Curated annotation (Swiss-Prot):
Name of encoding gene: rplP
Record keywords, A-Z: Ribonucleoprotein, Ribosomal protein, RNA-binding, rRNA-binding, tRNA-binding
Taxonomic lineage: Bacteria, Bacillati, Bacillota, Bacilli, Bacillales
GO biological process, one term: translation
GO cellular component: cytosolic large ribosomal subunit
Highest taxon, organism lineage: Bacteria
Protein name: Large ribosomal subunit protein uL16
GO molecular function: rRNA binding; structural constituent of ribosome; tRNA binding
Family: Belongs to the universal ribosomal protein uL16 family.
Job description of the protein: Binds 23S rRNA and is also seen to make contacts with the A and possibly P site tRNAs.
Classification via InterPro entries: Ribosomal_uL16, Ribosomal_uL16_bact-type, Ribosomal_uL16_CS, Ribosomal_uL16_dom, Ribosomal_uL16_sf
Keyword RNA-binding: yes
């Protein structure tokens, strides 16, 4: 499971997810990618489930890059506890994803295999996604 080795503070504010992604909006390493179309928190468990779905479909061939990292802790209070008496204990880790962010990249497999692998991964994520392909001039083409 992905998580930071150490953090300065155990608890963080929730923050706002306004606007589009500033960086990581183009395919950098692979040939095909999965791009977020909405803002969301993605947990380390969801990232791992998507990674497993992709690698299983590709029969462990090709290469997968995970371009998001769950660096934000989220907290939760126990069940049936009254309001107040402080913030809850850290429950898990999330990656903040904004629209336009490339979350996963794949190389070394055919387009049909990559498209199906990324479709399976998209079903594991709580955000609407689209398949993108690297163009010859360095950018990506927005195919659906």
């Amino acid at each position: 499971m992905l998580m930071p080795k150490r953090v300065k503070y155990r608890r963080e504010h929730r923050g706002k997810m306004r606007g589009r992604a500033k960086g990581g909006t183009e395919i950098a390493f692979g040939e095909f990618g999965l791009q977020a179309l909405a803002a969301s928190w993605i947990t380390n468990r969801q990232i791992e489930a998507a990674r497993r779905a992709m690698t299983r479909h590709m029969k462990r061939g090709g290469k997968v890059w995970i371009k998001i990292f769950p660096s934000k802790p989220y907290t939760a209070k126990p069940l049936e506890v009254r309001m107040g008496s402080g913030k809850g204990a850290p429950e898990g880790w999330v990656a903040v994803v904004k629209p336009g962010k490339i979350m996963f990249e794949i190389a070394g497999v055919s387009e049909e295999v990559a498209r199906e692998a990324l479709r399976l991964a998209a079903h594991k994520l709580p955000v609407k996604c689209k398949f993108v392909k690297r163009e010859e001039n360095g950018g990506e083409s927005n195919e659906n």
